[in-house]
Design a protein with these regions (language model features):
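ATPase nucleotide-binding head domains, primarily ABC-like/P-loop NTPase cores
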Residues: 2-218
Length: 218
């Protein structure tokens, strides 16, 4: 369980837009939104404040209630030309590490100390920012859906930011584990960012709009 009131990223200071958010055990939150709308910063806010709380440090929220769990994030995957690892291959390696991490947590292996016979399982919270970017759109969607369906069978909760609006259809899954949230923008003569999370699926995108703004100059 994770319940934050007026939570924000510590690096933003006074200009931060604060958000409320609750994560329930065995539930998954698919977050959509335009570029620069606040998805990645929000994911980091959740992770950073959890780590601060577990370290006994002040948190950047009016209120934060948490359960004890293991945290796994995948935010900035990079390729490795030196070792012949492409971006997509690096993503697969990271997702395999995640699966192993979650299994070990569920089996209690991560907490087993030398000489102890008992194992104490621990839940996992995963924070994923736009997985499988290194492949085409359809392959990415199918792969992401298959991965989430598999991970949902384990004692795991997750927050997944994505540009794949089709992935939001997982909310209709019979399990009831998937929930849609978004960061919406307003498009007028310019783009207005609210940075406030809300229920639902993002309706507006800004890539073409902003590109047209650039093209108008030339």
């Amino acid at each position: 369980m994770f319940e934050g009131k007026n939570l924000y990223h510590p690096f933003l200071g006074a200009k931060a837009v604060k958000n409320d958010f609750t994560i329930k055990d065995d539930n998954y939150y698919i977050i959509t939104g335009a570029n620069m709308a606040g998805k990645s910063t929000f994911l980091r806010s959740l992770g950073v404040n959890y780590i601060l709380a577990m370290a006994g440090m002040p948190v950047f929220a009016d209120q934060l209630k948490i359960s004890r769990f293991r945290l796994f994030s995948s935010m900035r995957t990079t390729d490795d030309l030196t070792h012949g690892i492409s971006y997509f291959n690096a993503e697969l390696i990271r997702l395999e590490e995640l699966l192993k991490f979650c299994r070990e947590s569920a089996e209690g292996k991560c907490r087993k100390k030398s000489g102890e016979d008992n194992k104490e399982p621990l839940r996992t919270l995963i924070i994923l920012d736009e997985i499988l970017k290194g492949t085409n759109s359809l392959d990415k969607l199918n792969g992401s859906r298959k991965f989430l369906e598999a991970i949902a069978k384990q004692p795991v909760s997750g927050i997944i930011a994505t540009h794949d609006l089709e992935l939001s259809k997982m909310e209709n899954d019979a399990s009831g584990k998937f929930h849609n949230y978004c960061f919406e923008i307003d498009l007028g003569t310019d783009v207005t960012y609210t940075y406030k999370i809300q229920k639902g699926v993002a309706r507006n995108q800004n890539a073409t709009f902003l590109l047209n703004k650039i093209l108008e100059k030339y």
